[in-house]
Regions:
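N-terminal cap/lid segment of alpha/beta-hydrolase-fold proteins
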Residues: 2-30
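The alpha/beta-hydrolase serine catalytic core
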Residues: 20, 119, 126, 131-217, ...
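Short beta-strand element of the alpha/beta-hydrolase
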Residues: 33-42
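Conserved alpha/beta-hydrolase
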Residues: 56-78
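Catalytic nucleophile-loop/oxyanion-hole region of alpha/beta-hydrolase
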Residues: 75-104
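Alpha/beta-hydrolase fold nucleophile elbow
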Residues: 104-115
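Glycine-rich nucleophile elbow surrounding the catalytic serine of serine-hydrolase chemistry
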Residues: 113-123
Length: 256
């Protein structure tokens, strides 16, 4: 980007022909070297959601560049929502990490993700454990594979050995049964056990989508993890987003 580096840059990152909509936001001053945080939204979400942009701006304010990405089938990226799977999101994440590694100003790389994005960064972080300096899963939905194996997901019950061709997402859109079949094969516990670098988990204790017990269990299982519970808050932090931002700011300040 040169000496007059742009404060914000919109781009497409291509993952095997699929264009992923992305925005790079720089701290002040934009020039020089900076650590970077990749920020990933959740299921049915996008990178312009209130909690996603607020986390990115908080990180920009303490010297981090941020790279927000719309994942496969979400936001303004390619792909149909109904055809997205956790494998596709995971390969998206790995591609974005590789893109970030190629940016000449980047020193360290961190991953932050909300809900399904939180589980995605848990998986990608384990695969790139020698590259990623820290993880911030926000209300991570790592119960998805367990629900897929048990036959209860998205508020629906089904035979896990005979997965239906289509399911309904909570916003009314349909979801291909392959989403469930892929999820059944994933063991997030293995990813947690492989990751030894510092982790911050933030979770509302009245989360209506991902029970807070999953955040607590993941924090206990990680070798180096700080857990911050937000009293009385929901999955998307409708009541106390400021406390989430405070937790992220405190944990990340001075880390790179």
């Amino acid at each position: 980007m040169g000496e007059e580096r742009e404060k914000m840059k919109q781009m497409y990152i291509t993952d095997d022909g699929i264009r992923l909509n992305a925005k790079l936001d720089m701290p002040e001053p934009a020039e020089g070297k900076h650590p970077l945080v990749i920020v990933i939204h959740g299921f049915t979400g996008h990178m312009e959601e209130r909690h996603i942009t607020a986390v990115a701006k908080t990180l920009n304010g303490i010297g981090y560049a941020t790279l927000r990405v719309d994942m496969y089938g979400h936001g303004n990226s390619d792909g149909k929502f109904e055809n997205h799977t956790l494998y596709k999101w995971l390969t998206n994440a790995l591609t974005v990490i590789d893109y970030a590694r190629g940016l000449d100003f980047v020193t360290d790389i961190y991953l932050c993700g909300h809900s399904q994005g939180g589980m995605t960064v848990m998986l990608a972080g384990a695969m790139k454990h020698d590259v990623i300096k820290g993880l911030i899963p926000l209300s991570p939905a790592w119960m998805i594979p367990e629900g897929a194996r048990k036959g209860t997901l998205l508020g629906q019950d089904f035979d896990p050995d005979h997965v239906p061709d289509l399911l309904a997402a909570w916003d009314g859109r349909t979801l291909n049964g392959n989403y469930v079949r892929v999820a059944q094969t994933i063991r997030v516990e293995d990813a947690i056990d492989r990751y030894t670098v510092p982790v911050l988990i933030v979770h509302g204790d009245e989360d209506e989508a991902v029970p807070v017990e999953y955040g607590i269990e993941a924090a206990k299982r990680y070798r180096d993890c700080k857990l911050v519970l937000i009293p009385g808050d929901t999955h998307c932090y409708d009541h106390h987003l400021d406390q989430v931002l405070d937790a992220v700011r405190e944990w990340m300040t001075g880390r790179s």
